[in-house]
Amino acid sequence: MEEEEWSEEQQRFSYLQRLKAAVHYTVGCLCEEVASDKDMQFSKQTIAAISEVTFGQCENFAKDLEMFARHAKRSTINTEDVKLLARRSHSLLKYITEKNEDIAQLNLEKKAKKKKKLEDENRNSVESAEAGVEESEN
């Protein structure tokens, strides 16, 4: 039993380290991009510090999103939870809202196409069935 717990703990630690490495890599890439645009440099310590702060903020975001969903008696986080999280940053909230509306519009268009396709298929199958009935009557 203890060995299982230790193995799970080790897997969790390994997963956490991979996540931290991914955040560190992404922060490093963004810092390189900013450095080339602004003609400046970031030290490795600065990149590491930004990475740590970013990872910590992501952990806080995840906990907040879970709490928002739980408060609404849901087990799934939805866009309303994300909007609530972003409420203090007006530009971010605006961006998220616009993207959400774009996605909703695309979903409506897909639904309409699917409905039209089903109606066309139903119409074709009814027409072919009627044609078959006419042939058998003759």
UniProtKB/Swiss-Prot annotation:
Residues 112-138 are annotated as: Disordered. The keyword RNA-binding does not apply. Signal peptide: none annotated. Pfam families: CENP-S. GO terms for molecular function: chromatin binding; DNA binding; protein heterodimerization activity. One of its GO terms (cellular component) is Fanconi anaemia nuclear complex. Its main location: nucleus. One of its GO terms (biological process) is resolution of meiotic recombination intermediates. Keywords: Acetylation, Cell cycle, Cell division, Centromere, Chromosome, DNA damage, DNA repair, DNA-binding, Kinetochore, Mitosis, Nucleus. The modification N-acetylmethionine is found at residue 1. It is found in: Nucleus; Chromosome, Centromere; Chromosome, Centromere, Kinetochore. The keyword Methyltransferase does not apply. DNA-binding component of the Fanconi anemia (FA) core complex. Required for the normal activation of the FA pathway, leading to monoubiquitination of the FANCI-FANCD2 complex in response to DNA damage, cellular resistance to DNA cross-linking drugs, and prevention of chromosomal breakage. In complex with CENPX (MHF heterodimer), crucial cofactor for FANCM in both binding and ATP-dependent remodeling of DNA. Stabilizes FANCM. In complex with CENPX and FANCM (but not other FANC proteins), rapidly recruited to blocked forks and promotes gene conversion at blocked replication forks. Heterodimer with CENPX, sometimes called MHF; this interaction stabilizes both partners. MHF heterodimers can assemble to form tetrameric structures. MHF also coassemble with CENPT-CENPW heterodimers at centromeres to form the tetrameric CENP-T-W-S-X complex. Forms a discrete complex with FANCM and CENPX, called FANCM-MHF; this interaction, probably mediated by direct binding between CENPS and FANCM, leads to synergistic activation of double-stranded DNA binding and strongly stimulates FANCM-mediated DNA remodeling. Belongs to the TAF9 family. CENP-S/MHF1 subfamily. This is Centromere protein S. The gene is CENPS.
